[in-house]
Amino acid sequence: MKIITWNINRFDGVWDWYEKKKDKDTKYREKMAKAIIGYLVKLISNEDDVAVLQEFPYYEYNGSIQWGCDEYSNWTSLFEKNNLTVIEPYKKGLNVTVAVVPKQKSVWKKTDGDDCKTSFKDGYLNKYIELLKEFRILGIHLPSSSVLLPLLHRMGEADRPDLILGDFNSGDYVIKNRWDEERECERQQYRKLINVYGYTDISGGGVTNHITGSSIDHFLIKNTVLFRLNIKNVFIDDNKTLSTLSDHYPIIVELEKKF
C-alpha cells in the first residue's frame, strides 16, 4: 500500500500563483498537470494506493477569485483519462484538498457524515478530505490548527484519524512578517498533535518546500503497533525533475501489508 501527500501548487509549477498570476498561462498549467499525473500513475496502481493533494484548483484565479468559473472539472477529466479518480471534499473553495485513487477499483471512500463536514468553519472546510478504509485518513492543508485541534478533542481517542497528512505550514521560519508569525503559530499547534494527542511524525524532518528550504509537509500516524510494525518505507522524493512541477516535494509512505 502506498500513501502519498503532495502540495501541487495549482499546477503552476514553482510559480507563486498568488503573486505572479501564472494561472493565466493555460498551456503551461496543462503541461504541469500532465507531468504530475504521469508521476502519480506510476505510484497509484493497487486498489489501496491513495494520494492526497493540496492546492488542487477549484475556481479560477485572475487577481481575485472567479467564483462563477469552475475549472475543477477540466482538471479532474485529465485524471480520469489516465484511469485515476479524484475524490473532492464536501465544500468548495479557490483551492481544495483532494484524494486521488485508482479508477473503478479503489477501496477508499469519502466518509459519510464526516466530522469535517459538520465541524469546520466556513473557509477552512475546503482544505480537508476525510477517507475511510479499515482506518481513517485525514488529509489537510493548514493554516487552521485552531479549528483542527478542537475537532480532535471532541472526537475522543477512539474516533480520531489514524493518519493525518498534508501541508501543515509548520516549518521553522525566520519571522520577518505577519505571515511568518502565523506559521510559527502553526508550528506550535503542530507540536500539540505530537505532545498532546500522541501522534508520531514519520516524515523524517527533511525539506519538503524546496523554495523556502522548510519542512512544512508532514505524515502523522497514531502511535500504535498496527502502524509502526507495518511501515516499509518513508521518503521525500526530491528528484530534480519534481522540483520543476511544484514548490513542494511529495512524501511517500509504503506499508508492508494490506489492511
Predicted regions mapped to residue ranges:
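Metal-dependent phosphoester-hydrolase catalytic domains
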Residues: 159-163, 169-259
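Active-site environment of divalent metal-dependent phosphoester hydrolases
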Residues: 10-13, 58-62, 94, 145-147, ...
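His/acidic metal-ligating clusters that form di-metal
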Residues: 133-136, 148-170
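Active-site metal-binding loops of divalent metal-dependent hydrolases
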Residues: 6-8, 56, 142, 167-168, ...
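Surface-exposed cleft-lining segments at the edges of enzyme active sites
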Residues: 18-27, 114-118, 135-148, 172-178
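Soluble or luminal CAZymes and related metallo-dependent hydrolases
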Residues: 24-39, 67-71, 119-123, 143-153, ...
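N-terminal, active-site-proximal structural segment of metallo-dependent hydrolase catalytic domains
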Residues: 1-77, 258-259
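Structured beta-strand-rich core segments of catalytic domains in phosphoester-bond hydrolases
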Residues: 50, 54-135, 142
